[in-house]
Design a protein with these regions (language model features):
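Membrane-embedded architecture of ER/inner-membrane glycosylation machinery
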Residues: 2-10, 15, 172-174, 178, ...
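Membrane-integral, polyisoprenol-dependent glycosyltransferases
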Residues: 2-351, 531-538
Length: 547
């Protein structure tokens, strides 16, 4: 499938280089998976669903603090709960659960590498992986407790199944079907919808109207059926109402209502954010398309990647919820197209990208070290004051191990950017190495500062210290899903909704401006607090005043 590109010679990937690239990807992947609390907003509520499985052993109905949460199927939550349970003797539950993200991201890197190898030749597997690792949109999201990482794995397997279909249709069908199933059990109907439209669009091209491709599609459907039916059937057996709530209220019904309403004011959202989300792969992908423009619609590899990207872009742009994290699947065809550019990219352009990356990340590294040192030494620099204002509750302290890791990584980066051989691939490798350095610095010397602002642990500890020794129950007012999940995890507190008439305590979430609560008569405020890094989000505890 890569006839056009095999005509161009390029250096082989030696075992030593392959080992270095594997180490780079492993460091990028593993950094940040452990060592910090669940962060607001997405990690907090996602872990709340996982924590319910661990506490109740209910594997069928996703539940958040005793209330069904039917937004997504539970595959990611199952995986995270299993890992959290297995690793509980050595890791906190939330760290063990986050390793599910590491597992799915590792599978994503594996299948994007196999896709690059299948589409563009044996030397392109590592290039595809490095291109994806370097995308700025992957850095934080690929290390969070979110179901989107499992969806990304499913989409990557689907792309590999398509790429393999013209050569090994049976195996391709199995992989494609499993990818559809993983995507469905992670985020719902988006993966089957992508499969339908990508397959239909590819059949418009003569190169894909073959018996092998039809065989692949049929096998994929058969292999996907168990994934698409077993959990929904079990859910229906448990509760027909919850099944309807999941399938219609939170998924199909919302989409049909959105389409009927015609509110498309954010339809170009992904077009606007992709330039930074997919940087630097996007300009490389654009160059590959431009360079091969005369043959682009006659080469199966370009047909697959362009069709996949366009289908993802259109499909994800006409859904009720538009968020940056939902664009992650679009990074896959972009990274693979960027891989194709390495044969034709001009050396001057590669050098420009290389030096831009080195200078940018060198300045960022200096700023991170300078800011950390300023906080530790408590100097009077402007940046130190800004950092203190951003996290007013942060108490800086020196920790030898994180400092040693950060210092070693910085020195290693300086050596590597000067020692990487002169080639077009150098710009991608240096960029990915630089992104990894930034992530290491953030997850070592800067982690306590970040955790102070994103964790609810200290706020909930303070709340518990101010609770009366005896009380009946706590009612909640306007407490969000993420906050309720963390109240249960850190404080073993389960505030009840719509229970202000029966409970003797009332917990209210609001802003920093003290506003009267509903029917404030009969209540007395006994505590107020919030996360140290957020002066706007406040929690107030009231107790009922006996008349």
């Amino acid at each position: 499938m890569y006839e056009y590109f095999t005509k161009l010679k390029e250096p082989e990937i030696t075992p030593l280089k392959a080992g270095f690239l594997f180490l780079l990807c492993a460091v990028w992947l593993l950094t940040g998976l452990i060592g910090h609390d669940p962060w607001k907003p997405d990690e907090a509520y996602s872990f709340g669903l996982i924590y319910h499985i661990l506490q109740s052993h209910d594997w069928i109905v996703p539940t958040l603090v005793d209330e069904p949460y039917m937004d997504k199927p539970p595959l990611y939550y199952w995986t995270a709960a299993i890992l959290a349970k297995l690793l509980a003797p050595i890791l906190p539950l939330h760290d063990g659960a986050r390793l599910a993200t590491g597992l799915y991201t590792a599978l994503t890197l594996l299948f994007i590498g196999l896709s690059g190898r299948e589409l563009f030749g044996k030397n392109r597997g590592w290039a595809a992986v490095i291109a994806l690792v370097g995308c700025l949109g992957m850095l934080i999201r690929a290390h969070e407790i979110i179901t989107d990482n499992a969806l990304l794995t499913g989409c990557t397997m689907m792309l590999y199944g398509y790429a393999l279909s013209l050569r090994r249709p049976t195996l391709a069908g199995v992989i494609l079907g499993i990818g559809i199933g993983i995507g469905f059990l992670s985020k719902g109907f988006i993966a089957p919808i992508l499969f339908f439209f990508i397959s239909a669009a590819l059949l418009l091209f003569r190169e894909w109207r073959t018996r092998a491709f039809i065989t692949t599609l049929l096998i994929a459907i058969v292999c996907a059926l168990p994934w698409l039916t077993i959990w929904p059937w079990l859910l229906f057996q448990r509760s027909p109402q919850l099944f309807v709530d999941w399938m219609w209220t939170h998924n199909l019904g919302r989409w049909f209502g959105f389409v009927k309403g015609g509110d498309y004011h954010e339809v170009f959202y992904y077009v606007k954010i992709l330039p930074w989300l997919a940087w630097p792969a996007l300009p490389l992908a654009a160059w590959a398309v431009w360079e091969a423009r005369k043959k682009i619609w006659h080469e199966p590899e370009f047909q697959l990647l362009l069709v996949s990207f366009l289908v993802m872009l259109v499909t994800l742009s006409i859904v009720p919820d538009i968020k940056e994290v939902f664009a992650l699947p679009m990074l896959l065809p972009i990274a693979l197209l960027a891989t194709a550019s390495l044969s034709t990219l001009r050396r001057g352009a590669a050098n420009a990208l290389d030096w831009f990356g080195i200078m940018t990340f060198a300045l960022l590294a200096i700023a991170l070290w300078w800011g950390w040192g300023g906080l530790l030494l408590d100097n009077n620099a402007w940046i130190t004051h800004q950092l203190k204002n951003a996290q007013p509750g942060y108490d800086p302290d020196f920790h030898a191990i994180p400092f040693g890791i950060a210092f070693f990584a910085t020195m290693a980066w300086v050596v590597l950017v000067w020692r990487v051989g002169r080639s077009v691939r150098r710009s991608l490798i240096n960029w990915a190495t630089s992104v990894t350095l930034m992530w290491i610095l953030l997850m070592t010397i800067w982690l306590p500062w970040l955790d102070t602002g994103k964790s609810y642990r200290h706020m909930i500890d303070d709340l518990k210290d101010n609770l009366p020794k005896k009380y009946n129950c706590i009612a909640d007012v306007r407490i969000g899903d993420s906050q309720r999940a963390m109240l249960q995890y850190f404080g073993n507190l389960n505030p009840k909704r719509n229970a202000s008439r029966t409970c003797d305590l009332l917990l209210v979430q609001g802003d920093r401006i003290s506003k009267p609560i509903e029917d404030e008569i009969g209540w007395e405020k006994m505590w107020e607090g919030g996360r140290k890094g957020d002066a706007n989000e406040r929690f107030r505890l009231y107790r009922r005043v006996k008349e």
